[in-house]
Every structure is written in C-alpha cells, then in structure tokens.
C-alpha cells in the first residue's frame, strides 16, 4: 500500500509537470523493504527523475520497471535527461542543487539498499539517466506465504 501511495502522489506531480510516466510493477509476495524504507527509496528516485525531466524541454519521460528476478527484486528507473551531471574528485555523482539541504537523495538510496544487502548502479548518459537497484528477496519468507 505505501508503494501505491508514493506512485500515485508522484504520478500526479508528473502529470501536472507534463512528464510522461510509464511503469510496469510486479511485486513478490515477500517485499524486502519496510514501509519507511519503501517510501524513502521510491520518493528519492522519483523526485530525482522529476527534477531531471524539468530540464528537458521536449517530451520529458520517466519509466519505472519493478520485477522479481531469481532471488532479487530489480527496480529500474530511467528518465530523460539534459546531461547536466556534476561529479566529485572520486567520480561520484553530486547533487545538481545548491544548498546544504540538498544532495541526500542518492545517499538515502544507498543507505536503504545496502541495509538490506542489495546494491545499486547509476548509468548517466547524454539523453537518459538510469538507476538500477537490486534487493534480495527472502525465498524462505516467500515460500511461507504460498
């Protein structure tokens, strides 16, 4: 239910901003995140995508794909991008926002992902940004729910 609430709220925001949103969501019976971590993860990746789309003048879009694969839940979010990326000396992405209140989104994604034994990868390109998140799904819990 919390994922539905986050997606509905962000869909409304995207619609209001003229961003095309496509999604495909297949959830396992044993969802690997708490409601708080679910909200944190999806709010951050969707907010980042919405912000990036605002710098794309023509036909901004976001695509979200959530599906189980083996013992992992794969979350892939891609969005149109104007490629205005900033990096630190280590090659890590930096926030495009100014001020100390900004730049926590990817750190929160990393915290949530790593806390449950998962990982994430970002793939910025000239016209698209993709984040792929893999979260382990407990097969024992899933079998017990059958």
What is each stretch, according to the model?
Residues 71-103, 142-144:
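Glycine-rich/acidic phosphate-handling loop/turn and adjacent ATP-lid/helix
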Residues 59-71:
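Short beta-strand/loop element within the Bergerat-fold HATPase_c
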Residues 116-127:
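Glycine-rich ATP-binding loops of the HATPase_c
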Residues 21-42:
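Conserved short strand/loop->alpha-helix "switch" segment adjacent to the catalytic nucleotide/phosphoryl-transfer site
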Residues 35-58:
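Conserved ATP-binding N-box helix of the HATPase_c
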Residues 1-17:
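Short beta-to-alpha transition helix within the HATPase_c
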Residues 83, 125-132, 138:
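Glycine-rich nucleotide-binding loop
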């Amino acid at each position: 239910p919390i994922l539905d609430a986050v997606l509905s709220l962000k869909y409304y925001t995207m619609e209001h901003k003229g961003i095309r949103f496509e999604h495909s969501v297949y959830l396992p019976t044993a969802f690997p995140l708490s409601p708080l971590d679910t909200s944190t993860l999806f709010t951050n990746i969707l907010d980042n995508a919405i912000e990036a789309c605002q710098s794309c003048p023509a036909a901004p879009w976001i695509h979200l794909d959530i599906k189980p694969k083996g013992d992992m839940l794969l979350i892939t979010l891609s969005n149109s991008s104007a490629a205005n990326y900033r990096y630190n000396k280590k090659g890590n992405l930096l926030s495009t926002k100014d001020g100390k209140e900004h730049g926590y989104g990817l750190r929160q994604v990393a915290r949530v992902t790593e806390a449950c034994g998962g990982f994430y990868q970002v793939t910025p390109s000239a016209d698209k940004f993709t984040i792929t998140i893999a979260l382990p799904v407990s097969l024992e819990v899933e079998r017990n729910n059958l």
